[in-house]
UniProtKB/Swiss-Prot annotation:
One of its GO terms (biological process) is tRNA 5'-leader removal. The keyword RNA-binding applies. Consists of a catalytic RNA component (M1 or rnpB) and a protein subunit. Pfam families: Ribonuclease_P. The gene is rnpA. Signal peptide: none annotated. Keywords: Endonuclease, Hydrolase, Nuclease, RNA-binding, tRNA processing. It is an enzyme of class 3 (hydrolase). This is Ribonuclease P protein component. It catalyses: Endonucleolytic cleavage of RNA, removing 5'-extranucleotides from tRNA precursor. InterPro entries: Ribosomal_Su5_D2-typ_SF, Ribsml_uS5_D2-typ_fold_subgr, RNase_P, RNase_P_CS. Belongs to the RnpA family.
Length: 119
């Protein structure tokens, strides 16, 4: 993911949490903040130490990033997204992560209909 497509700073995370809305399932919570005039979406990841050791946390983050890279064309731009991984995400395969993120993205209405890459 390109640098300008990432949310890194604490104040940016806080703004998404405070001003955006959230949608969740058992494995992930997605906070969404619409941003006018921004041509692309930005993603911030939060994986707590409760999930596991550094290797596990980094693996979960890699899987989430891969999902967003694969579905870049289907995801609505002009928004900031913060994805929080919950404990069950640590033991999931990529196919399970993809299904779970697809589900929560559909609930949040951030994926444009009929544009699904690689099922």
């Amino acid at each position: 993911m390109k640098k300008e497509h990432r949310i890194k700073r604490s104040d940016e995370f806080s703004r998404v949490f405070n001003e955006g809305f959230s949608v969740a399932n058992r494995q992930f919570v997605i906070y969404v903040l619409p941003k006018e005039g921004q041509d692309f979406f930005r993603v911030g990841l939060s994986v707590s130490k409760k999930i596991g050791n550094a290797v596990t946390r980094n693996r979960v983050k890699r899987l989430i990033r891969t999902f967003f890279q694969e579905h870049e064309q289907a995801i609505s731009g002009e928004r900031d997204y913060v994805i929080i991984a919950r404990k069950p995400a640590a033991d999931m395969t990529y196919e399970q992560v993809k299904g779970s993120l697809w589900h929560v993205c559909k609930k949040a209405k951030i994926i444009q209909p009929k544009v699904r890459a690689h099922k």
